[in-house]
């Protein structure tokens, strides 16, 4: 991959694609800025590194080569002068780059600005009864530079409830509505409950949670922690604030709002699900997305789209939800990096929590900003999104997000009985069981264009499915199964008795078994029966 800048016939950077992301090759030899998530158990590769240019940038890949990629660039106002990137420029700024790298490596969770002149820290422990709040008022001009908190819990369920029942509200400069309204756990960047991780502006550690967003105000700030649950909560908190380094005029108020389905999917914009919609002048700084996906399978094929200042076509449009959050290939494994993390996982079945903070790549807007992400699966039967959006907004701007009732914040994620391919799944099988859309392998070849897909299991594992017989009688049994290059050898049984012999599902290509596989004749009584699938092994040719 070669990068050409400002019309030069010679590339400013000429490297193998993989070398951009290993943290070892100059000028990107900073492992906190150039990294492979494979090294921490996930998948995907990222490079956070400024490459300035004055006139033009052209990025060229080798002929007949391709991969998934995203490039983020920003255009400065006319008249702005920047140096053209080269290896020598990177050496000149090596001290600053090393400073950032070292901070990311060892000091996340501390203010990157260090101790600020004139800063003050308020520390307290509050007992907040149900329906009550703890309140703190500050006089400006100042900026809140850190909020930290810690609670004790009875168990995981209590933890999940408390972090959604407690709400942080912050009102700036006498405004009628709070600019910050967010369940406490989501404000600290993850959900549900407490999930330990560190990013640049937010994190949760053994010592408690932190948020390091810079939150300036001109005259006053009212900070409230409201208990909308049924249990008294004891909260230990710290709040650090400091004088402004410049007049408040020209700065923006920090906004942080939690929401679910505030803007329903519209027919003309389906499947765009709103992350943030706001009017005025400001900067978009990112989101945390809590996904509830009881159906299992991949939830996030949708692309992100950012419409700035009334654009009819988005200036940012992505390639998939996991790509936006900085990882790849639907990988559910945890990772934590300064600007993006996967902080909670249930293997893409159940809860997933991901975040992407736009700090170096924040998105400025003068009139309006709309950010959305495509959501292909409907709320019923069960894929639900909850979003925490963070942005700065000049006074007088429009923030359309109001408070969300407590019954819509906690307990809405109920696990339905597991079902896949039309079969109720009994018990908790090993691996992952889901319904897979088979349209891409041939329209009409499978009933309802889908099948039950069992992955992540090993020889000896069993999958039990419920079969309902409507009338007692003698039945000739058969099954249509799918064959593929990576499928195994299975044995089917009904109510503990084997049906025919082992079935080899290997084939170099994805096909249904036609004609259906004969399974013999059985006398079956009316009611429920159990069909068992056992993995025996695999064909030597299978991959």
Each model region followed by its residue ranges:
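Beta-strand-centric surfaces of beta-sandwich/beta-rich domains
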Residues: 1-419
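Extracytoplasmic
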Residues: 304, 408-543
């Amino acid at each position: 991959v070669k990068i050409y800048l400002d019309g030069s016939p010679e590339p400013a950077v000429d490297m193998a694609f993989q070398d951009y992301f290993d943290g070892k090759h100059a000028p990107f030899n900073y492992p906190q800025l150039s990294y492979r998530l494979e090294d921490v158990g996930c998948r995907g590769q990222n490079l956070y590194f400024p490459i300035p240019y004055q006139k033009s940038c052209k990025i060229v890949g080798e002929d007949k080569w391709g991969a998934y990629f995203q490039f983020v660039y920003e255009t400065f106002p006319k008249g702005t002068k920047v140096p053209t990137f080269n290896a020598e420029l990177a050496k000149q700024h090596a001290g600053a780059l090393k400073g950032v790298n070292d901070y990311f490596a060892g000091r996340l969770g501390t203010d990157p600005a260090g101790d600020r002149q004139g800063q003050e820290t308020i520390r307290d422990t509050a007992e907040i009864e149900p329906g009550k709040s703890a309140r703190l008022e500050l006089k400006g001009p100042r900026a809140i530079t850190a909020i930290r908190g810690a609670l004790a819990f009875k168990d995981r369920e209590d933890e999940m409830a408390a972090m959604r029942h407690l709400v942080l509200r912050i009102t700036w400069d006498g405004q009628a509505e709070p600019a910050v309204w967010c369940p406490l756990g989501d404000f600290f960047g993850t959900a549900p409950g407490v999930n330990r991780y560190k990013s640049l502006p937010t994190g949760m550690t053994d010592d408690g949670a932190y948020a390091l967003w810079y939150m300036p105000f001109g005259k006053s700030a009212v900070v409230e922690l409201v208990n909308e649950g049924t249990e008294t909560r004891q909260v230990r908190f710290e709040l650090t604030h400091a004088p402004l380094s410049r007049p408040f005029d020209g700065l923006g108020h920090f906004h942080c709002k939690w929401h679910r389905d505030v803007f329903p999917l519209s027919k003309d914009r389906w499947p765009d699900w709103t992350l943030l919609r706001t009017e005025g002048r400001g900067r978009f700084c990112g989101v945390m997305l809590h996904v509830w996906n009881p159906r299992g399978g991949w939830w996030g094929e949708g692309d992100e789209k950012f419409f700035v200042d009334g654009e009819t076509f988005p200036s940012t449009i992505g390639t998939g939800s996991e790509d936006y959050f900085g990882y790849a290939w639907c990988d559910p494994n945890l990772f934590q990096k300064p600007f993006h993390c996967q902080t909670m996982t249930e293997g893409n079945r159940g809860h997933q929590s991901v975040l992407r903070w736009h700090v170096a790549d924040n998105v400025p807007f003068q009139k309006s900003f709309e950010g959305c992400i495509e959501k292909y699966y409907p709320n019923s039967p069960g894929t639900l999104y909850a979003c925490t959006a963070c942005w700065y907004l000049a006074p007088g701007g429009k923030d359309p997000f109001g408070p969300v009732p407590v019954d819509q914040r906690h307990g809405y994620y109920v696990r339905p009985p597991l079902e896949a391919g039309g079969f109720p799944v009994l018990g908790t099988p090993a691996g992952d069981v889901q319904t897979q859309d088979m349209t891409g392998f041939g329209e009409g070849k499978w009933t309802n264009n889908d099948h039950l897909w069992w992955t992540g299991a090993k020889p000896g594992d069993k999958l039990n499915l419920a079969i309902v017989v409507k009338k007692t009688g003698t039945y000739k049994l058969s099954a249509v199964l799918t064959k593929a290059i990576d499928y195994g050898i299975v044995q089917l049984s009904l109510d503990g008795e084997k049906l025919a012999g082992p079935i080899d599902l290997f084939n170099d290509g994805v096909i249904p078994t036609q004609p259906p596989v004969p399974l013999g004749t059985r006398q079956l009584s009316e009611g429920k029966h159990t069909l068992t699938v056992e993995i025996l092994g695999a064909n030597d040719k299978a991959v």
